[in-house]
């Protein structure tokens, strides 16, 4: 591992050494009360997911294009949005996948984040669209992410990107997609991502099967939502055990993967699976930077707040090291 790479993994990644877990979350941080009140009771099921998709077409986070340019690539498959900073300071790039439980969401949802990364890092940020379940179950999203990776490689010279300096990341389901894409690229050989940025990633279908997670309140993404999303993504399959690259936590051998930044809030439904995955990466010899935010709910960084600012700053620092 190159000198200077952040290699911090907290003892909190061991569920047995920490008082809080997905089944026993701490109080929500006071700074997140407004966000929790606004979106905490989000319901995602077979009736609402279509409405969420429709709303996503018309209600988007405010995107300020100052300091960046936006280009869409429709050359093949799903569209890819490329956000390039006016001032380039590196020849790497960040591929960033949106969230939405694999059943809703659009690249435009993360444009504000992508623009922030582009300006902070001085490199292009690529936001690929991917097909959504249940209409397009696994492996559709993975295949779209895989195609996006190769489309970026094909355009790397024209975009001023060094193929050896591309970080793959994502939020929630997009983080799970990023982790699975990293697995697939590792197994296929060929050009590899420089690092992976896993932001409260959706990694383990077995979480949805845990009935002990039905009682605790998990803001924004509940296990009821999870219990709809995973079967939808898996195409009605009972679990992901026999589906390689569907649920990243199912992978037995994590050795040889690129350095990872992994972050989650301590009130997130995904806490146990994310904490365990980070610990397993470290045990497999992968350089891991793990951040667990006390009182953080799922997607707590979607609104401006002090916890989000600190959380995002760590992501920028990690990514900068690999794209500079």
What is the meaning of each model-derived region?
Residues 305-324:
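Catalytic active-site module of serine/aspartate enzymes centered on a nucleophile-bearing elbow/loop
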Residues 262-264:
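Short beta-strand/loop motif that positions the catalytic acidic residue
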Residues 108-126:
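Short amphipathic alpha-helix adjacent to the substrate-entry channel of hydrolases
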Residues 2-86, 306:
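A glycine/proline-hinged amphipathic helix-loop "lid/cap" segment
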Residues 170, 174, 178:
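Gly/Ala-rich beta-loop-alpha elbow adjacent to hydrolase catalytic centers
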Residues 296-307:
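Catalytic histidine-centered segment of alpha/beta-hydrolase-like enzymes
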Residues 153-167:
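Gly/Ser-rich "nucleophile elbow"/oxyanion-hole loop immediately N-terminal to the catalytic nucleophile
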Residues 183-240:
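Hydrolase active-site cap/lid region
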